[in-house]
Amino acid sequence: MDSPRGISTATGDAHAEAAVSPAAEIQIKTEAPDVDGPEATTECLDHTYTQQTSGGDGLDAIDTDDLLEMVLTSENTESEPGIPFALRGNFICCRDDNCRACRELPFRPSVIGFSRDPHVSMALDMTSGNWAYVPRVFPDTPTAPWMANYCIPDLDEHAD
């Protein structure tokens, strides 16, 4: 059975997979491009995040482009025009040749164990009480105004 793009199921049945792992509400799937397709020459991987639907009857895919747009929309619009990922300090961008997370691979995974992707961190939204993906932060990342509503464990971790 084919799964819709972005849904990560080992058995092919989203209902059975959700029942097997109720604690894993957020799953990460990395897809390599088809070898036969024209995209085979690119070295980028498609990082697609999935989360369990509120009804518990399946998984919704969250594309990283949508994630990026949500973060940039929520941040003030004082960034420089033309930069695809305009965040300050030690935030990183997978499109940046100087990407700190890419340079430091294999990166130190989060102690809380949520995300193994070097380009995102998990943060607790203090207004809604939900966990959300935010662009990767490091313990020495300077604070920004948008962080006021989030508890970001990666900011509190000590470098190894």
From Swiss-Prot:
This is Gene 34 protein. Residues 1-11 have a biased composition (Polar residues). Residues 1-26 are annotated as: Disordered. It comes from Equine herpesvirus 1 (strain Ab4p) (EHV-1).
